């Protein structure tokens, strides 16, 4: 009951915040339209309680740490049974809190054990006009028609070893017509782009560092990519265990990478790199790990990576 109360309180808060945001913009991915948690909206509530600044509250069954995403009047999120055997998509009406869809998407025969710090529904969905893509890590990815809830396509082959006790957390993102997903497990590490209409693979690029030389718990990561400028175009800056990469978002070709000593990079507070002009700031993981900063190289791979290790203290 305590965990359900926390889930409800969090959901009510996010609804109230995004209710104002959505008047001028769609909150279509993890941490909003720009991926950095910022909004141009004003007049957002600064405090709330059970009786203050709450328009509605809707119970969400089971457990899930995914953030809601909003398009129009729809709010989508995911949830899963505590042991991960059943995975669900939830949609509610933004204005009333009324349940629109409660869809059982996947059954999982043998989910890996996780701790209470994670759930089997932690990755945040991504949404655009008419489609929502919901990702559960190795356990499945689905694209739904937002009006009917009909399943348009699924993928259950993006498999990796999420590590016993850890579980999935990397959220998908949309880059033009592709859904980009990180698959960074203990056994395999790659980034993949799927056609958002068909779900077919557009490109798939293995991580180029030699992960077999790293301790096994340094290979896992929980991140998502961000777009950064590169000349007149863009590059996809992609954090992983022990490294930070950049790829051509159209072809998946690796443009550059830098190696660092951070590991277990996680979306707390930022599951994607923070891009500031030509500079990238990336959290290197939990405990006393290094937090690399570097240049988001505009002209391709540099002769010498311009990296600055900014700190070694544990950060939230």
What are these model-derived regions, one by one?
Residues 1-11:
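Bacterial N-terminal signal peptides that target proteins for export
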Residues 9-20:
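Bacterial N-terminal signal peptides
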Residues 22-316:
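Noncatalytic, solvent-exposed loop/strand surfaces
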């Amino acid at each position: 009951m305590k965990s359900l109360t926390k889930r409800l309180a969090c959901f009510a808060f996010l609804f109230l915040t995004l209710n104002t945001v959505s008047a001028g913009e769609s909150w279509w991915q993890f941490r909003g339209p720009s991926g950095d948690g910022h909004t141009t909206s004003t007049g957002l509530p600064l405090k709330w309680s059970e009786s203050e600044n709450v328009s509605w509250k809707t119970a969400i069954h089971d457990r899930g740490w995914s953030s809601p995403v909003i398009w129009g009047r729809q709010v989508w999120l995911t949830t899963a049974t505590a042991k991960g055997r059943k995975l669900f998509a939830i949609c509610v009406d933004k204005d009333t809190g009324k349940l629109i869809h409660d869809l059982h998407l996947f059954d999982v025969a043998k989910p890996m054990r996780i701790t209470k710090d994670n759930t089997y529904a932690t990755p945040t969905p991504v949404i655009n006009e008419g489609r929502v893509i919901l990702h559960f890590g190795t356990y499945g990815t689905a694209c739904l028609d937002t009006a009917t809830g009909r399943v348009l396509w699924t993928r259950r082959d993006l498999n990796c070893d999420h590590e016993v006790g850890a579980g999935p957390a990397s959220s998908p993102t949309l880059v033009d017509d592709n859904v980009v997903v990180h698959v960074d497990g203990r056994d395999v590490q790659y980034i993949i782009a799927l056609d958002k209409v068909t779900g077919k693979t557009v490109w798939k690029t293995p991580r180029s560092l030699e992960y077999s030389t790293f301790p096994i718990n340094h290979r896992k990561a929980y991140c998502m990519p961000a777009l950064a400028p590169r000349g007149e175009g863009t590059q996809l800056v992609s954090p992983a265990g022990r490294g930070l990469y950049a790829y051509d978002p159209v072809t998946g070709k690796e443009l550059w990478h830098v190696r660092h000593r951070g590991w277990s990079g996680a979306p707390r507070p930022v599951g994607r790199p923070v891009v500031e002009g030509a500079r990238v700031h990336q959290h290197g993981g939990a405990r006393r790990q290094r937090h690399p900063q570097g240049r988001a190289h505009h002209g391709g791979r540099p002769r010498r990576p311009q990296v600055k290790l900014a700190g070694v203290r544990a950060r939230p």
